[in-house]
Amino acid sequence: EVASIARTIGRAARLNEDLIEALALCHDIGHPPYGHAGEDALSECMVDIGGFSHNQFGLTIVEEIEIRYPDFPGLNLSLEVLEGQARRVDKSGTGPRPALEVQLVDAADSMTYDAHDTDDALKLRLVDLDELENLGLIRNCLKYVDSQHAGLDSGMRRKALVHRLLDLQVVDLLDTLGKSLDQRQFQSVDDVRASEFLIEPSSELGEMKRELESFLYQNVYRHEKLIAMRSEAQSRIQELYAKYVADPSLFPEKYLPRAHSIGISRMAGEYIAGMTDRFFEQTFERITGNQIRG
């Protein structure tokens, strides 16, 4: 979805669509099981060897781990893709700006997170719609939904809200970005890097996004139910990591050469980070003998 949204905006702005798609597909490729909770757990486990970063691991995957050619490791991606993965958007204002395509993927990622985290919060009943309607962005979206589709049941109204949240952000960014690029008239990527420019929503929508994100942080991400789930997930990752470090024979045989090359501790982190949630849980139960409660 991030790739689709970013390409749509990039096409209208006449940016490099192929680069946008490659960057979007690489964007979260390095995430371990359980997303950011898993990343924090692995980083804590690996603190003595430099920690763990899903961005850096994403680079490791496409440059070293994936083997598609007989003459060299990695996927043979272009310098622009690799640079985009390495140089994510830093809004501190220091250092050169990343390419516009990198910035656009970051903006599209923010859009989808806001929309789907709102959706998940409602589906899990962590918050209710009455609470969300106090927020300007949600109130704006629901007003539109109700004007177009009167009498929707709660489930369909929620889905329509999510669609409108995405649509509103896309239209806003298309308008804002188009005007900004017309004013700036960048001639090269070096012009972008040397500027103070960042792809961001309009000031009005940006303020409403920040209000929504603050609400989600306080009332969803810090919800006691999610904190408990996060803690359990992190404990499982730490337990399985310790098992692999203590007994490297648990690694599949084909991973042993890399384990000898980069060290057992780093290999344990990489191997776990490459798992899906489902495969991790199956592996955890098999190796530890502990059943994960549904």
Question: What is the predicted role of each segment?
Answer:
Residues 1-9, 14-18, 38, 52-294:
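Histidine-centered, transition-metal-coordinating active-site segments
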Residues 19-48, 55:
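Aspartate-rich (DDxxD/NDxxD/DxxxD) Mg2+/diphosphate-binding motifs
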